[in-house]
Amino acid sequence: MYLSSGWEQSIYVLLMLDQLPEGKYINSIFLSERLGVSDSYLKKIIKLLDNEGLVKSVRGKNGGIALSRPLSQISFYDVFVAIEGKNRIFESQNLLKRFLGEEEGKKAKRCVVTNSLDMIENTLVSNLTSITLSQVAFQAEMNYDLTDIRDWINHHQK
């Protein structure tokens, strides 16, 4: 399975935005510099997050981006959908009829390969949905010294 680099970048952007004080914003260029990623690509990612209601953006001198809801209300699946889209991971090509032969294929009710892949996809969606970014933020809080990122956010907020 492949997740784009935008998915990981999105997770870190959201974790960084969680460090902002209420009512404050940060410019995306600071985020791209901090993460060492392309600003133009990160702006596209932020637009996707904005479209899904995960962040809010404000234009102008004191503009920037901020979370639009708490991390406890954002799951890995929400980010996945924002960045990767709502398309299914697997779409059947209906190869069962060719595999069995046309006549036998007519008797088959459901493809066992499709059933298995649907179960895998459902498990993935369930797991992604069950993990919130607040859980990840809590783990980061317990395992890392976040002083530097907090100081950095305070210096760059608007």
Where are these regions (language model features)?
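Key DNA-contact positions within bacterial/archaeal DNA-binding proteins
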Residues: 40
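Glycine-centered, phosphate/nucleic-acid-interacting loop/turn motifs that mediate DNA/RNA or nucleotide
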Residues: 52-53
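C-terminal regulatory/oligomerization modules of transcriptional regulators
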Residues: 92-158
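Conserved segment of winged-helix/HTH DNA-binding domains
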Residues: 71-97
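Short alpha-helical segments that sit at the start of domains
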Residues: 1-14
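A short alpha-helical element within helix-turn-helix/winged-helix DNA-binding domains
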Residues: 26-36
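Minor-groove-contacting beta-hairpin "wing" of winged helix-turn-helix DNA-binding domains
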Residues: 61-68
